[in-house]
């Protein structure tokens, strides 16, 4: 079917936050004006209100706001009792911050391959990787798809491992009735601007049902203080900025609607792109309800498809073309090419298509049409 001139002109950025921010702008500005008048710039009522609301949203007792998702992971591991040299099993296919959190907390990352069925931790590989120094397992709910946490809980219980979740891309996602953030002892979330729940700068949070762990993270984020000038721990400066807490509090009530919008777009992509060319669509295991942070398709030459779409006004992304174990920063792990075949295949073949709340139906259809056009199936 030939496209009209109007359809040919449709531009699709990889991410457009305008539709999200425009209806919230007046309320956010009013809240910031109130903050200025109160001078409660750090650890004040606005922060506590957001922490309470986000904990309720996740289904946990506690939420501790921190400066980033990386800090949430790092401080969560420290508060959970990681010791120098403790091994932490984690997926080879992830953003590098997962590895950074482990080493910055004094641990040793033990990557394992991911499964073809969800691109997350292969639970069988986790069990095979457990050794005498293994203390933690760190599942990453990549692209908004939960790892198989029910099976992972069984393995962790059998070997005495502590689960700390990297839920930085999984706000509101569920699998087998388990909500992101509730599968382990603690979970880290990122509120980087492009996340399903995003701030207007860097921000993060740790959620948990463990009151002692939450108290330790509160101390760690504030120079190790449990009381003014009483430093029980060597800590950090990692507070969640109050202006970001204000932004997040305004956005949180809309998270479910925004996630529903992402699901709608994912469904259109699925209907329009299934069976096209050599594309493999994102796998969704039975019982999984992804948050669709990213919509990553597999193809033999993602760079070529990305270039084709770019010339037609459609932006794409790569998540992630270089696995951490093949990055110079992690050469000391001694894991060369071929160590994790599924991870390395995904790194070579994945291309992320635009998916975000407020994406117009014409934009979604334009993506479908142009991808089909590339494969000669328009």
Language-model-derived ranges and their functions:
Residues 2-7, 18, 30, 47-53, ...:
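PLP-dependent aminotransferase class I/II
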């Amino acid at each position: 079917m030939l496209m009209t001139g109007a359809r040919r002109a449709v531009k699709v950025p990889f991410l457009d936050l305008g539709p999200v921010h425009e209806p919230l702008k007046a309320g956010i500005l009013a809240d910031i004006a109130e903050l200025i008048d109160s001078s409660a710039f750090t650890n004040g009522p606005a922060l506590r209100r957001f922490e309470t609301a986000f904990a309720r949203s996740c289904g946990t007792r506690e939420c501790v706001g921190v400066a980033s998702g990386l800090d949430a992971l790092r401080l969560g591991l420290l508060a959970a009792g990681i010791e120098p040299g403790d091994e932490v099993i984690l997926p080879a296919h992830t953003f590098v911050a997962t590895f950074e959190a482990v080493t910055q907390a004094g641990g040793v990352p033990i990557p394992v391959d991911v499964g073809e069925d969800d691109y997350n931790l292969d639970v069988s590989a986790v069990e095979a990787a457990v050794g005498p120094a293994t203390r933690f397992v760190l599942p990453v709910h990549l692209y908004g798809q939960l790892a198989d946490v029910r099976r992972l809980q069984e393995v962790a219980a059998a070997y005495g491992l502590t689960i700390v979740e990297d839920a930085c891309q999984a706000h509101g996602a569920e699998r087998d009735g388990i909500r992101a953030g509730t599968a382990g002892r603690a979970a880290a979330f990122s509120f980087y601007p492009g996340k399903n729940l995003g701030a207007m700068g860097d921000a993060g949070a740790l959620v948990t049902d463990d009151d002692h762990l939450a108290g330790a993270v509160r101390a760690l984020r504030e120079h190790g203080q449990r009381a003014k000038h009483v430093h029980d721990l060597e800590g950090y400066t990692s507070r969640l900025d109050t202006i970001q807490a204000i932004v997040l509090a305004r956005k949180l009530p809309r998270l479910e609607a925004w996630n529903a919008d992402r699901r709608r777009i994912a469904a259109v992509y699925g209907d329009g792109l299934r069976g096209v060319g050599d594309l493999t669509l994102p796998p969704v295991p039975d019982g999984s309800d992804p948050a669709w942070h990213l919509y990553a398709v597999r193809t033999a030459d993602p760079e070529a498809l990305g270039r084709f779409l770019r010339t037609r006004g459609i932006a794409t992304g790569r998540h992630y073309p270089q696995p951490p174990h093949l990055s110079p920063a992690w050469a000391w792990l001694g894991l060369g090419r071929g160590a994790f075949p599924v991870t390395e295949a995904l790194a070579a073949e994945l291309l992320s298509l635009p998916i975000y709340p407020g994406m117009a139906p014409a934009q979604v259809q334009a993506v479908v049409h142009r991808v089909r056009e590339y494969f000669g199936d328009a």
